[in-house]
A protein has these predicted regions:
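Catalytic cores and adjacent flexible loops of soluble metabolic enzymes
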Residues: 1-171
């Protein structure tokens, strides 16, 4: 990749399926063969996001994608504030002053509320470890839920998810 002009490598795990130890092993292997920065992007959909980032950081990843907590977690990336605090006082300290983030977080809490109200959005309210079985990216989960809700069928969300492995197999 480098000899073809790549300036960095981005690993995108949009469904949050990458396990912490798989991330560790992948990053370690890549760092042995590449000198360009490596970025990891994962989601918290199945509850592994923060742990995956911690193991990737330990393995030497250069960049992790996060989102401020009003837009983070669940089907999004780990929260910026949480990762900053988790890495504080370690050899991986980001040197980000988390206290400077709070006013920004407060602002985006209001922005999120306005977006939810304006677009009548319902966001999933908890992680779903079974996502590893369904293999659906976080954005698609939110979209699927809102489509079902628009049809008055949000109560069938779990049933639709359970059918996904069958659809994948049939295709």
């Amino acid at each position: 990749l480098e000899h073809r002009g790549a300036h960095m490598l981005a690993i995108k795990d949009m469904s949050g399926l990458l396990s912490p130890y798989d991330a560790y092993n992948l990053i370690r292997m890549l760092k042995k063969h590449l000198s360009v920065p490596i970025e990891l992007h994962t989601h918290c959909t199945c509850g592994l996001g923060e742990m995956t980032y911690m193991k990737a950081v330990e393995a030497g990843v250069d960049i992790i994608d996060t989102a401020l907590s009003p837009f983070g977690e669940i089907t999004s990336q780990p929260a910026t504030e949480s990762m900053v605090m988790a890495l504080q006082h370690s050899i991986y300290d980001t040197d980000i002053d988390v206290d400077r983030l709070w006013p920004i977080v407060d602002h985006f809490k209001h922005v999120r509320k306005e977006l939810e109200d304006e677009f009548k959005l319902t966001m999933p309210s908890q992680i779903n470890p079974a996502v590893r079985k369904y293999q659906i990216p976080g954005g698609m989960l939110t979209n699927l839920y809102n489509q079902l809700k628009a049809q008055g069928a949000e109560d069938r969300f779990d049933e639709v998810l359970a059918e996904m492995p069958n659809v994948r197999r049939d295709l």
